[in-house]
Design a protein with these regions (language model features):
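ABC ATPase C-loop
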Residues: 161-162, 427-428
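ABC ATPase NBD coupling module
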Residues: 77-91, 195, 362-376
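Catalytic Walker B motif of ABC-type/P-loop ATPase nucleotide-binding domains
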Residues: 169-172, 435-438
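Conserved ABC ATPase "signature" region
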Residues: 122-140, 394-406
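H-loop/switch region of ABC-family ATPase nucleotide-binding domains
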Residues: 204-205, 470-471
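Hydrophobic anchor residue at the start of the ABC signature
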Residues: 158, 424
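Conserved ABC ATPase signature
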Residues: 144-148, 152, 410-414, 418
Length: 487
């Protein structure tokens, strides 16, 4: 990786409000040291993503609203510079990475931005090959983007940013849907980018993986910078202070519940080497034999029983589960490497994914009917339909999930974590007996992580089947009674 020109970033007295909304940023001042890694953290809705949109020029060139103050890159005001210049200086990995794709295949996507800047064809091929190798996704090059798992999409977005070769890279929750092995890959990539002189700004709730890489920390609250500290200071603040600041774990969490192994895919997860190792990392204790899952197999009398579930894609078997039981009255976590089939399982249960003939799913001994299962998707944008938060969910659920103050806001104007909680509120309103949540803590801060976990435990106590698909061990430790490891 070659050295990159260093860029100076500064925010001077910036206040900003999205159209029709309250101020999101209030008199923010921030300096980003060239060649350093600056971590921006804080509660959901505190303005972290908005800061990144200022730095890459999306505000005010794409997002309208009321803006005052100055955003400078190399002493040039971003708001007055041509938008195409921003693309030469900054690359961004967005919180919802699928929203930044413009083509249909991974290879085409990595070439798209350089092509727009008339980079020579041979150089584009070299950049693409290097980015694919850097993220360990060479096997995905010819894949249709629509067929990728959430974690794979995240890695493609990171590769896309690398291929642009900009001096500044902005990352908004870059590990939100990644398994532990992939998080380690992202950490290694960030380390190499930093060593090459790139200026990095990372907005994250999950911060343990950045230990030893962070130079500067900016903690935001209610649209203002409330704390600044050196990177090494953050990891010395102690547990009490960490919780007071609303930050998530500073050390890599280990799963408290011993998982039961489930061989869910014929021939393993796509035949990918190392998938079992990734699953072992996800649980901390190691994947166990499939037979260990039998003690929780159940007879389906009080829970969800799945039998002979097979799903194929493009003629290839991608999911094969002979028998699996999820008890009512408990929260079951589902872990496993990216691409192993966790989301496919969830979609099949909710009749969003066609299964082979012969599959049987029963709830309480009776056939599982449509509408009895509800899925909170990874991409929650697909589940928000109305003009206001109050139209999406009932007042009691908004109150329970700390959204009542946002009742008049448009759902798509919310932060990533707020959108996540809103869709969970709508799921509770549906009174589904099987509730499946796919990576429900993407963009969620520590306080709301604990609140969501408590809500899920309450829902389970009401007799529901609650299934949580997650790589977030910190969250699973808060809510899961049992864990299944798909390998």
């Amino acid at each position: 990786m070659t050295a990159a020109a260093r860029a100076r970033l500064a925010i001077r007295g910036v206040s900003y409000s999205y159209p029709g909304g309250r101020p999101v940023l209030d008199d923010v001042d921030m300096d980003v040291t060239p060649g350093a890694l600056t971590l921006v953290c804080g509660a959901s809705g505190s303005g972290k993503s908005t800061v990144l949109r200022l730095l890459n020029g999306l505000i005010p060139n794409f997002h309208e609203g009321e803006l005052s103050g100055r955003v400078l890159i190399d002493d040039e005001d971003v708001s007055s510079a041509p938008i195409e210049r921003s693309g030469l200086r900054t690359a961004t990995v967005f919180q919802n990475p699928a929203s930044q794709f413009f083509t249909t295949t991974v290879a085409d996507e990595l070439a798209f931005a350089p092509q727009n800047y008339r980079v020579e064809a041979g150089e584009i091929r070299r950049r693409r090959a290097g980015a694919l190798e850097e993220l360990g996704i060479g096997d995905l090059a010819d894949r249709d983007l629509r067929t990728l798992s959430g974690g794979q999409v995240q890695k493609v977005a990171c590769a896309q940013a690398l291929a642009q070769r900009t001096p500044v890279i902005l990352l908004d929750e870059p590990t939100s849907n990644l398994d532990p092995r992939a998080i380690d890959d992202v950490r290694a990539t960030i380390g190499r980018l930093k060593a090459a002189g790139r200026t990095l700004v990372v907005a994250e709730h999950r911060i343990y993986f950045l230990r030893g890489l962070v130079d500067e920390v900016v903690i935001m609250g209610r649209g203002r910078v409330v704390h600044r500290m050196a990177g090494e200071v953050l990891w010395r603040i102690g547990e009490a202070r960490r919780k007071e600041l609303g930050l998530r774990a500073l050390e890599r969490p280990r799963l408290a519940v011993r998982p039961a192994g489930l061989a869910a895919i014929a021939g393993g997860p796509g035949g990918r080497p190392g998938a079992d190792d990734a699953a072992e990392d996800a649980v901390g204790n190691g994947a166990v034999d499939v037979d260990d899952a039998d003690d929780a197999a159940g007879d389906g009398a009080d829970g969800l029983l799945i039998e002979n579930l097979q799903v194929e894609r493009s003629g290839r078997l991608v999911l094969d589960i002979p028998r699996l039981f999820f008890p009512a009255g408990a929260v079951t976590g589902v872990v496993g490497a990216n691409g192993v089939g966790k989301t496919t399982l969830a979609r099949a249960v909710c009749r969003l994914q066609r299964a082979r003939r012969g599959a049987r799913m029963s709830l309480g001994g009776r056939e599982l009917r449509s509408g009895r299962a509800f899925l909170v998707m990874q991409d929650v944008h697909r589940q928000l339909f109305t003009e206001s938060v109050s139209q999406e969910a009932s007042a009691p659920q908004l109150e329970r999930l700390d959204l009542a103050a946002l009742a008049d806001r448009h759902p798509l104007s919310l932060s990533g974590g707020q959108k996540q909680r809103l869709v969970i509120a709508t799921a509770i309103d549906q009174d589904a007996r099987v509730l499946i949540l796919d990576e429900p803590t993407s963009g969620v801060d520590h306080r709301h992580l604990v609140a969501i976990a408590a809500e899920l435990r309450d829902l389970a106590r009401e007799g529901r089947v609650v299934i949580v698909i997650s790589h977030d061990v910190e969250f699973l430790n808060e809510c899961a009674d049992r864990v299944i490891d798909m390998v």
